[in-house]
Amino acid sequence: MTFELQHTDNASDARTGIITTDHGQIKTPIFMPVGTVGSVKGVHFEELRKQVKAQIILGNTYHLYLRPGLDIIKAAGGLHGFNGWDRPILTDSGGFQVFSLTGIRKLSEEGCEFRSHIDGSKHIFTPENVMDTERIIGADIMMAFDECPPGQSDYQYAKKSLEMTQRWLDRCIKRFNETEPLYGHNQSLFPIVQGCTYKDLRREAAKFVADKGADGNAIGGLAVGEPTEVMYEMIEVVNEILPKDKPRYLMGVGTPQNILEAIERGVDMFDCVMPTRNGRNAMLFTYNGTMNMKNKKWENDFSPIDPDGCDIDVITSKAYLHHLFKAGELLAMQIASIHHLAFYLRLVTDARTHIEQGDFVQWKASVIEQLGRRI
């Protein structure tokens, strides 16, 4: 994997670039739809390609490990062979999911024991077997296995957690270097910067990660309940240290406003379940504001969902989508999910254009003001 930094904004830290993988190029800034179990919920890959224009999707190591399981994925030739997606894939390490299993997990220096949320069976994730698992899944970008401490952890817990995450990172890198890709395409490993909301821990973590010389770096443990201004401050602290010639990935974030603010602070890659989750709940982001498609006000509105959006936005009226939600039709959630994902991809594409034009900061300010409206 390579990263070419193309443009840097004169008035902010926003930048554009191109990530090149064996499965294709990714223009940054980029939003990555989340395909937890190897699929993006409610959206066919053909729609992801043509309507959403997704350049890369995510897979979830925890969920894929449990179901369908590694034997099936390996027999299919990796996740690309199993699900038929021919563009880049990134897999998280499963750490966030495992550490969300409060009460059914046990943490130690070795790794994390946990019970499956499916059948209660017992498993363990270690830095070594997570690297092996991600090799079998075969994603173009693999994430290191880290501990994800609760967002409001006290300083001592956060420090202890970070120290273990750093030891685990060394083990991940060692295992990664000892193993080879299984399916004929290269894979890259991204370390993750943790440290909760403590500046000194974030700086320490960023320096530790930067020194590893990885192909790209991630920022984790944010958007977990802290005020947004604190999140932005942590991004600034970390990006002052992370190398400028490598892509920076902010994990699990977030709203359109969050994404634009993070782009301004030098972040290149994003993922979040919000587009599909909010879409399934009838809440639609647009450049004019947020619409609740269950509201009666749309009952007789025959204008397009978004006249400047993807093809489905243009041919579907607000009244029709309102009707589908009120009738409980699955098509409503599908249309809304496609709209949302296409909107997120359009947002980062427009951000890229304005960074190149040199007016990103002004454009962002006007867009954020509109995005906050309820219509």
Walk through the language-model features, giving the residues of each.
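Non-catalytic, usually N-terminal nucleic-acid engagement modules in DNA/RNA processing proteins
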Residues: M1-L182, K296-W298
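C-terminal extensions of enzymes
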Residues: M1-T20, I26-P33, K41-G42, D146-Q152, ...
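Conserved, mostly hydrophobic/aromatic
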Residues: G24, I57, D92, E134, ...
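Short secondary-structure capping/turn micro-motifs that flank functional sites
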Residues: Y65, P150-G151, G225-E226, N278-G279, ...
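A non-catalytic, amphipathic alpha-helix used as a structural packing/dimerization or gating element
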Residues: N129, T133-I136, K160, M164-R171, ...
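Structural signal for hydrophobic packing residues in well-ordered secondary-structure cores
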Residues: G138, L169, I173-F176, E180, ...
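Glycine- and acidic
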Residues: G151-Y155, K159, G216-L222, L330-M333
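Glycine-rich phosphate/ribose-binding loops and adjacent secondary-structure elements
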Residues: E163-Q166, T179, G184-I305
